[in-house]
């Protein structure tokens, strides 16, 4: 079921987890503790077992129109000409033949996930009604999964098309009439040029999504760690357009998914890098095949046509902790812990809503995902483990243990953020020119004071010129960490 992303019924809960009434009880308990529930809403597709798909197979035209069903191979070929493969290893192509429908059904991700036809107003109304139902159960944030794929236009790659923002703004306006506290979070893991469109540009400014994953920040952090050079990161983040003051980033270093190297070609060339070669280097480095690499990752979806090779792996294993522990290398362990803490401090320090993937705060390593036959064909499960609560207990009881050192480092950064008004979401982060290629520097200008942050992405001590800081700071300086 693609890890839960093939939804057969939007209005019921998986029976082993509970009921819709249990969901309402959960959200009430969370609200009482100041926690908002974020729910994935998979807007691009439904499971082939969904009632809409079953009715389409039964020949009901109303529901056939919920999907993109093509009659001939020539039609398929015309669309496929411009469409990339998302999962080339196990789901080649974007269409699947269905005998009952007697047609080719659009299925971007897997043959069991049928893409919805958002040009059909009935699909829009179905999802608006669903949002109202779930909001009445206490859901406050909808993570719009695969939002970048929902509009189809012949002759394009059918990603990031402008009609997406028309649809999203319309959904947002409608849901806020009945549930004004609801927020939208865009799952748009796209290139830097397309990313901020999901906040809204032009007439959509500030009227689309309230939060977006800062995919570019995540990619640039890992790129800088591999190269020990912040030049590309400085260039890429400096070009990030301003966002509406009513929106914010969701910052992260790892999540449930693979890492795709969305490095802009122009950014790479400006810093003297060949973009194709650099993406290949990053895949080699984080899969552990590059000489001297500290990482233990896995290649996910090797596409020989495009050269795209994404990476799976837990944050700690990608940051070098697994290899250092296995080789009994204390210095390597120290360096890996420093990387892990730095990554978390950076996502906390950039502003926005930091997302910490479960287990990363104590340094959980790659999971033995192949033991589960249902996961063996998808190595993304290497970073989707069951929580290791014994590591949490160790982190609290033994501050000098590896989990304890990581946890205390992350907690120190969290506490510093809590004390600092400069992290208000309306404040933009400004990347500043750094005189040292191993140190990224950014600032957060706030009416109560200007914050400057420095991140050393190398294993080595760096001497940083004090005059650079004096030119950016006020007379009275406070160190937060």
Which residue ranges define each predicted feature?
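Active-site and adjacent substrate-binding regions of carbohydrate-active enzymes
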Residues: 1-481
């Amino acid at each position: 079921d693609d890890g839960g992303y093939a939804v057969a019924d939007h209005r019921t809960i998986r029976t082993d987890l509970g009921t819709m009434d249990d969901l309402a009880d959960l959200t009430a308990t969370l609200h009482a503790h100041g926690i908002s529930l974020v729910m994935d809403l998979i807007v691009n597709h439904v499971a082939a077992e969904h009632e809409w798909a079953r009715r389409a197979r039964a020949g009901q035209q109303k529901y056939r129109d919920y999907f993109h069903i093509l009659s001939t191979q020539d039609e398929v070929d015309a669309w496929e000409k411009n469409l990339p493969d998302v999962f080339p290893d196990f789901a080649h192509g974007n269409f699947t033949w269905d005998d009952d429908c007697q047609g080719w059904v659009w299925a971007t991700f897997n043959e069991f996930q049928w893409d919805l036809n958002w040009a059909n107003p009935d699909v829009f109304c179905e999802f608006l009604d669903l949002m109202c139902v779930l909001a009445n159960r206490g859901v406050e944030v909808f993570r719009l999964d695969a939002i970048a794929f929902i509009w189809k236009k012949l002759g394009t790659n059918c990603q990031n098309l402008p009609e997406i923002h028309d649809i999203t703004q319309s959904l947002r306006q409608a849901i806020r009439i009945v549930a004004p506290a609801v927020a939208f979070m865009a799952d748009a893991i796209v290139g830097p040029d397309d990313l901020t469109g999901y906040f809204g540009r032009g007439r959509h400014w500030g009227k689309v999504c309230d939060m977006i994953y800062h995919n570019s920040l995540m990619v640039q952090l890992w790129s800088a760690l591999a190269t020990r050079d912040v030049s590309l990161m400085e260039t890429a983040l400096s070009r990030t357009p301003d966002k509406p003051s009513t929106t914010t980033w969701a910052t992260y270093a790892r999540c449930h998914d693979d890492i795709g190297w969305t490095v802009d070609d122009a950014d790479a060339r400006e810093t003297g890098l060949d973009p194709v070669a650099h993406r290949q280097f990053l895949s080699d480095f984080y899969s552990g095949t590059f000489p001297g690499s500290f990482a233990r990752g896995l290649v996910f979806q090797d596409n020989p046509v495009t050269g795209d090779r994404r990476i799976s792996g837990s944050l700690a294993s990608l940051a070098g902790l697994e290899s250092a522990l296995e080789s009994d290398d204390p210095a390597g362990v120290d360096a890996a812990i420093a990387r892990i803490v730095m990554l978390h401090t950076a996502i906390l320090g950039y502003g926005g809503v930091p997302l910490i993937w479960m287990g990363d705060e104590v340094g959980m390593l790659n999971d033995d995902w192949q033991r589960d036959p249902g996961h063996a064909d998808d190595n993304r499960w290497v970073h989707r483990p069951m929580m290791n609560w014994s590591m949490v207990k160790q982190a609290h009881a033994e501050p000098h243990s590896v989990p304890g050192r990581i946890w205390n480092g992350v907690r120190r950064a969290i506490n510093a953020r809590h004390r600092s008004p400069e992290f208000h979401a309306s404040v933009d982060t400004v990347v500043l020119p750094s005189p040292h290629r191993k140190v990224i520097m950014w600032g957060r200008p706030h009416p109560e004071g200007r914050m400057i942050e420095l991140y050393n992405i190398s294993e080595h001590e760096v001497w940083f010129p004090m005059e650079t800081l004096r030119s950016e700071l006020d007379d009275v300086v406070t160190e937060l960490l």
